[in-house]
From Swiss-Prot:
Its main location: membrane. This is Olfactory receptor 8B4. The lineage of its organism: Eukaryota, Metazoa, Chordata, Craniata, Vertebrata. It comes from Homo sapiens (Human). InterPro entries: GPCR_Rhodpsn, GPCR_Rhodpsn_7TM, Olfact_rcpt. Odorant receptor. The gene is OR8B4. It is found in: Cell membrane. The chain crosses the membrane at residues 26-46, 55-75, 99-119, 139-159, 197-216, 237-257, 271-291. SUPFAM superfamilies: Family A G protein-coupled receptor-like (SSF81321).
């Protein structure tokens, strides 16, 4: 079955963040600034890790992938979002499904990249003598490969459940991107199976990743509290603290968004709440990790010296 046959709608209209004309330019400038910071921050961190052999460690391998994912999923919808502020907000059916797939792929993958990073911190703090043996290149590769496989499977499930729906009455998406819940509201056929797929996939991915991270955190915290010296505890907390902040921002804002949009008539609130985890979190992650890390600052200093001198 072709995409055209699966739906009588050939294009969608994205409502965007606001329908007030006087807000379009300020919002365009605001999100352009956020997008520039996101691209520069994540691309800069990717480059810094790539060209500095001293940063070729398991922790920075995971951080490299986190920055890559943040950069990619921000690029999936932000350019279209910026264009919609200054022109007609139309996206084709194929374009909408493509955007949905890649958005779900990168968001789902990030959940398990954060799990891998939590496991990495657990091994580093709780079993430091076995760290390089446990976190071998093969293990790191398998953890990342598994993260992307989970992301791909989740994206296929979400997109496949949308492709089976028929959109015939309305083509106005009450959002600034093609997401599952706003699309479900437009279907003129039964959405029972698609809703079931959505809640199973989101529930499994969120619950498994959250439980894994919480267990890692509990073990890390119990180990840190057993460190006799205040200096040792402070160092352990500093390496662990940035990851806590990133995880709390990502899972907290994402969970709040989907809980908000699950209630009838609350899509408008969810639209604004989703800005935080789709736009703000990818912008903040490079700062959260690099500004608190001495290795990053040292590597940046060496890189700037090589470039300038």
């Amino acid at each position: 079955m072709t995409l055209r046959n699966s739906s009588s709608v050939t294009e969608f209209i994205l409502v965007g963040l606001s329908e007030q004309p006087e807000l379009q330019l300020p919002l365009f400038l605001l999100f352009l600034g956020i997008y520039v910071f996101t691209v520069v921050g994540n691309l800069g961190l990717i480059t810094l890790i790539g060209i500095n052999p001293s940063l070729h460690t398991p922790m920075y391998f995971f951080l490299f992938n986190l920055s890559f994912i943040d950069l990619c999923y921000s690029c999936v919808f932000t350019p279209k979002m910026l264009n919609d502020f200054v022109s007609e907000s139309i996206i084709s059916y194929v374009g909408c499904m493509t955007q949905l797939f890649f958005f779900c792929f990168f968001v789902n993958s990030e959940c398990y990249v954060l799990v891998s990073m939590a496991y990495d911190r657990y091994v580093a703090i709780c079993n430091p003598l076995l760290y390089m043996v446990t976190m071998s290149p093969r293990v790191c590769f398998l953890l990342m490969f598994g993260s992307y496989v989970v992301g791909f499977a989740g994206a296929m499930a979400h997109t496949g459940s949308m492709l089976r729906l028929t959109f015939c009455d309305s083509n106005v998406i009450d959002h600034y991107l093609c997401d599952v819940l706003p699309l479900l509201q437009l279907s003129c056929t039964s959405t029972h199976v698609s809703e079931l797929v959505f809640f199973i996939v989101v529930g499994v991915i969120t619950m498994l990743s959250s439980i894994s991270i919480v267990i890692s955190y509990a073990l890390i915290l119990s180990n840190i509290l057993c460190i006799p010296s205040a200096e040792g505890r402070s160092k352990a907390f500093s390496t662990w603290g940035s990851h806590i902040i990133a995880v709390a921002l990502f899972f907290g804002s994402g969970t709040f968004t989907y809980l908000t949009t699950s209630f009838p008539g609350s899509m408008n609130h969810g639209r604004f709440a989703s800005v935080f985890y789709t736009n703000v979190v990818p912008m903040l992650n490079p700062s959260i990790y690099s500004l608190r890390n001495k290795d990053d600052k040292l590597a940046l200093g060496k890189t700037l010296k090589r470039v300038l001198f």
